[in-house]
């Protein structure tokens, strides 16, 4: 009997030690990412950054940032690299997680822009005019205040899209709040409202097409969609495949970890 108790006690100690060792993954900066299990959203800047900059990484790519966060909560991975505002939305809903910032990310912000098929000068010019008019006329500031309010209370504007005879298709990945996400049965967000204004200015009816982020550029190239509004960062690799509008927002990458 005593021998059984000793064995059980020893086993409990081993399991307790194992549990403690798992909980002691310390990540406080970029420097701590080497050799860790990192989750990212497939096709994003975060994925490319991890591939290029983190040594001995065990990289897992997910359809959405939330999918990566769920694996983080379940201890299948050690951290998630994601854009700041979507990361904040995830952490607000998951109090056991927190955000780590790093000066490397803060000092190298990325710019979001709308993408069109290479050579689609007419649509690109129309989009650029809308962005310029929004900034000059105050509509852009109103949109920022609606979806990124200081008090955190988002106000979704009424649908602004025109009912034209011609349809323009916006491709997005509706898992990137506050830029694009699902609210009830509708896809809403900063980019979606901006897309509505773009369509209205062009006298066209907007159709929003939701798909995986890494499917957006192939869909644009094939003509399945007409433009991408999905918190897409401008970089040299993407410039080879699409034409970008004037930029409309700056963001940075952050690290999500368990508390």
Each PLM stretch: what is its role?
Residues 36-39, 55, 73-82, 86, ...:
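Alpha-to-beta junction loops
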Residues 48-54, 99-104, 128-165:
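Ligand-binding clefts/hinges and TM-proximal coupling segments of bilobed small-molecule sensing domains
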């Amino acid at each position: 009997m005593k021998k059984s108790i000793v064995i059980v006690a020893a086993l409990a100690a081993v399991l307790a030690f194992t549990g403690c060792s798992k909980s002691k993954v310390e990540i406080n900066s970029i420097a701590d990412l080497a050799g860790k299990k990192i989750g990212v959203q497939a096709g994003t800047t975060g994925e490319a950054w991890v591939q290029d900059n983190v040594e001995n990484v065990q990289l897992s790519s997910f359809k959405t940032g939330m999918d990566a966060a769920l694996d983080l909560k379940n201890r299948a991975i050690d951290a998630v690299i994601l854009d700041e505002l979507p990361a904040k939305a995830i952490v607000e809903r998951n109090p056991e997680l927190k955000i780590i910032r790093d000066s490397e990310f803060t000092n190298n912000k990325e710019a979001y822009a709308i993408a069109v098929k290479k050579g689609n000068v007419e649509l690109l010019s129309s989009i650029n005019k809308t962005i310029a008019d929004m900034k000059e006329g105050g509509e852009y500031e109103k949109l920022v205040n609606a979806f990124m309010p200081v008090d955190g209370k988002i106000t979704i504007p009424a649908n602004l899209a025109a009912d034209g005879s011609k349809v323009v298709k916006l491709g997005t990945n509706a898992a990137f709040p506050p830029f694009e996400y699902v609210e009830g049965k509708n896809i809403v967000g900063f980019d979606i409202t901006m897309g509505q204004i773009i369509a209205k200015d062009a006298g066209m009816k907007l159709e929003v097409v939701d798909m995986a982020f890494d499917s957006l550029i192939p869909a644009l190239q094939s003509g399945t969609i007409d433009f991408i509004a999905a918190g897409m960062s401008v970089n040299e690799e993407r410039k080879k495949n699409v034409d970008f509008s004037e930029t409309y927002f700056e963001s940075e990458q952050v690290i999500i970890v368990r508390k």
